[in-house]
C-alpha cells in the first residue's frame, strides 16, 4: 500500500473519521461561509457547545478540502509554468528544484483555530468564513516579501519531506500532453539560488556575501525579516494585518466577524491596515477607483510624507464577466501573472476564495486557505514557520475562476511605478474585448466624501467604487459591487 504523501498530510486532521457521521443536514448548516449564530454573536466566553461546534466545523472543513489532495497535481513538462513573474520548464531536475524553492517560499496563510476571541463575538476561529481575508493576507504578504526581503530570496529551512515522485506520465489521449506529477518534493536542496541583491536595510556585508546554498543555515538578519513578515499576519489583536485587525476594519464597511468578505472590500481593508501600521511608513496601498488607476493619485500618495517616495502596492478590484468568467480576458490574466511586478490575484470560485500565483496552459496555480490549523504564537522569538509555507501546489481550470477578483501589483520606486504602468498597459492591450480589464490614466480620480469601503480618516483620497454601469438587478451587496467589463 502506498504511503501517505507529506502534501496530503498537510490537509489531514484527526477528526476526519467524522466524515461518515456527518448528515446531510450537517453539511448544509456547516457549509462554506456558514457560522452558527451562537458562536458569531455575543461577547462572552464561548461555552462548551460552541467549542464543540467550532471543532466539528474545523474537522469537517479539513476533511472536505483534504479531498483535493487525493489526486496528484500533474505538470506539463513541455509547457512553461508561470509563477509570480518567473517562468519554469520542467524538462530537468534543476528547473523542478528551482520551482520548488520559489513556490514553497510563498507565505501560506490559512484558517486558524483557538486564537483569541474576536471583538464583538465569541468566535475563536475563522474557519468557514475567513478565506477571502486569508487570500488577501497572502497577497499583501507577497508584497511585503518584495518590499523587505533580498531579491530572489528563498526560504532555506523548508519542510523535511521524504516522499519523492517525479513520475513522467505518458499521454493518455491527444488532448492530454505528457506531464510531470509533483505531489511532493525532496527535502534535500539540489541547486543553489542566484546571488541575491538585498533590499534597503541589508548591510554592505550581506550585499557582498556569496550566494548561500539553500541547505546552509539561514542568514540571521534575513531570517528575522522573514519572521517579521509572517508575524504581521499573526492571529492576535496586536498584529497589524492579522484577522483581528482586519475584522475591526471591516466594521467600517458594515461587516462583522463571520460574514463573507468580497475581494473589493478586502482590498480596502488592507489599504487601511497598511496606512495605520506605524512600522510600514515607507509603504502605501492604493486601491483603483472604477477599474482605473489614476497616476497622479498614486504619485501623491507615495510622496505624501517626509520619508521620500513610498513603495506602493496597487490593488485593482475588477469583475471579469457577468455570472462567469469572460474567456476573452483569460489572456490578459495570463499576461499580468507573467509580470514580475504582479503579487498575485485574490478571488476564486463562488464563496470559495483562492490566491492565484501563476498558471500553466489553461490552468491556474493557487494557494488554498481552506485548511484549518492550530494558532501559532508569533510573538515567540523562534516560532515555527512550517505551517506558513505550503509544499503542495494545486491547479484549477480558468473556466472555474469566479469573475470577481482583485489584482495585486507592487512598485518599489518611482521608476518602478512608471515601468509598471507601461508593462501592465501592454499586458492589458492583448484583450479582444473593447474595454480593457482596467486602465492607467493621468490626473486624479473623484474624491468621495461619503463613508464606504474606502472610508476612514487615516488616508486620502478615499477610493470607492461607483457602479453606474451595473444593473440594478445585480444581487451582489453594495459594498462588493464591480464595474462589469
Curated annotation (Swiss-Prot):
Disruption phenotype: Morpholino knockdown of the protein results in neurodegeneration in the central nervous system (CNS). Neurodegeneration is characterized by severe visible malformations in the developing CNS in regions that correspond to the midbrain-hindbrain boundary, the cerebellum and the hindbrain region. Its main location: cytoplasm. Keywords: Autophagy, Cytoplasm, Hydrolase, Protease, Protein transport, Thiol protease, Transport. Residues 22-46 are annotated as: Disordered. GO terms for molecular function: cysteine-type endopeptidase activity; protein-phosphatidylethanolamide deconjugating activity. GO terms for cellular component: cytoplasm. The keyword ATP-binding does not apply. Its EC number is 3.4.22.-. The active site is at 131 (nucleophile), 368, 370. It catalyses: [protein]-C-terminal L-amino acid-glycyl-phosphatidylethanolamide + H2O = [protein]-C-terminal L-amino acid-glycine + a 1,2-diacyl-sn-glycero-3-phosphoethanolamine; [protein]-C-terminal L-amino acid-glycyl-phosphatidylserine + H2O = [protein]-C-terminal L-amino acid-glycine + a 1,2-diacyl-sn-glycero-3-phospho-L-serine. It comes from the Eukaryota. It is found in: Cytoplasm. One of its GO terms (biological process) is cerebellar neuron development. Cysteine protease that plays a key role in autophagy by mediating both proteolytic activation and delipidation of ATG8 family proteins. The protease activity is required for proteolytic activation of ATG8 family proteins to reveal a C-terminal glycine. Exposure of the glycine at the C-terminus is essential for ATG8 proteins conjugation to phosphatidylethanolamine (PE) and insertion to membranes, which is necessary for autophagy. In addition to the protease activity, also mediates delipidation of ATG8 family proteins. PANTHER family: CYSTEINE PROTEASE ATG4 (PTHR22624), CYSTEINE PROTEASE ATG4D (PTHR22624:SF36). Belongs to the peptidase C54 family. This is Cysteine protease atg4da.
Amino acid at each position: 500500500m502506498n504511503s501517505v504523501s507529506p502534501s496530503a498530510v498537510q490537509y489531514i486532521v484527526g477528526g476526519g473519521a467524522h466524515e461518515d457521521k456527518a448528515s446531510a443536514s450537517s453539511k448544509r448548516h456547516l457549509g462554506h461561509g456558514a457560522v452558527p449564530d451562537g458562536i458569531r454573536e455575543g461577547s462572552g466566553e464561548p461555552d462548551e457547545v460552541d467549542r464543540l461546534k467550532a471543532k466539528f466545523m474545523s474537522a469537517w472543513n479539513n476533511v472536505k478540502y483534504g479531498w483535493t489532495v487525493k489526486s496528484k497535481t500533474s505538470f506539463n513538462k513541455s509547457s512553461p509554468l508561470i509563477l509570480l513573474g518567473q517562468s519554469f520548464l520542467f524538462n530537468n531536475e534543476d528547473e523542478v528544484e528551482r520551482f520548488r524553492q520559489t513556490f514553497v517560499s510563498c507565505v501560506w496563510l490559512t484558517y486558524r483555530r483557538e486564537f483569541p476571541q474576536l471583538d464583538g463575538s465569541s468566535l475563536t476561529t475563522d474557519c468557514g468564513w475567513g478565506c477571502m481575508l486569508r487570500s488577501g493576507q497572502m497577497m499583501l504578504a507577497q508584497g511585503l516579501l518584495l518590499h523587505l526581503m533580498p531579491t530572489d530570496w528563498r526560504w532555506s529551512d523548508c519542510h523535511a519531506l521524504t516522499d519523492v515522485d517525479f513520475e513522467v506520465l505518458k499521454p493518455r489521449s491527444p488532448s492530454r500532453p505528457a506531464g510531470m506529477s509533483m505531489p511532493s518534493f525532496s527535502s534535500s536542496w539540489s541547486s543553489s539560488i542566484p546571488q541575491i541583491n538585498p533590499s534597503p536595510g541589508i548591510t554592505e556585508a550581506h550585499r557582498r556575501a556569496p550566494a548561500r546554498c539553500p541547505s546552509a543555515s539561514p542568514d540571521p538578519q534575513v531570517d528575522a525579516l522573514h519572521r517579521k513578515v509572517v508575524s504581521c499576519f499573526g492571529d492576535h489583536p496586536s498584529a497589524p494585518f492579522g484577522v483581528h485587525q482586519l475584522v475591526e476594519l471591516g466594521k467600517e464597511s458594515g461587516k462583522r466577524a463571520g460574514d463573507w468578505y468580497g475581494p473589493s472590500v478586502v482590498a480596502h481593508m488592507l489599504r487601511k491596515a497598511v496606512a495605520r501600521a506605524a512600522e510600514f511608513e515607507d509603504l502605501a496601498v492604493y486601491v483603483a477607483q472604477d477599474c482605473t488607476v489614476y497616476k497622479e493619485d498614486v504619485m501623491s500618495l507615495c510622496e505624501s510624507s517626509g520619508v521620500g517616495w513610498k513603495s506602493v502596492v496597487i490593488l485593482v478590484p475588477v469583475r471579469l464577466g457577468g455570472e462567469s468568467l469572460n474567456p476573452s480576458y483569460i489572456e490578459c490574466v495570463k499576461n499580468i501573472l507573467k509580470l514580475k511586478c504582479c503579487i498575485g490575484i485574490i478571488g476564486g470560485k463562488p464563496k470559495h476564495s483562492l490566491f492565484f500565483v501563476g498558471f500553466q496552459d489553461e490552468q491556474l496555480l493557487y494557494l488554498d486557505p481552506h485548511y484549518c490549523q492550530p494558532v501559532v504564537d508569533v510573538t515567540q522569538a523562534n516560532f515555527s514557520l512550517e505551517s506558513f509555507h505550503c509544499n503542495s501546489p494545486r491547479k484549477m481550470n480558468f473556466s472555474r475562476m469566479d469573475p470577481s477578483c482583485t489584482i495585486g501589483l507592487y512598485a518599489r520606486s518611482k521608476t518602478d511605478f512608471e515601468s509598471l504602468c507601461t508593462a501592465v498597459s501592454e499586458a492589458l492591450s492583448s484583450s479582444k474585448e473593447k474595454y480593457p480589464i482596467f486602465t492607467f490614466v493621468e490626473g486624479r480620480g473623484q474624491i468621495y466624501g461619503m463613508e464606504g469601503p474606502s472610508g476612514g480618516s487615516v488616508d486620502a483620497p478615499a477610493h470607492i467604487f461607483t457602479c453606474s454601469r451595473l444593473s440594478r438587478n445585480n444581487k451582489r451587496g453594495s459594498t462588493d459591487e464591480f464595474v462589469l467589463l
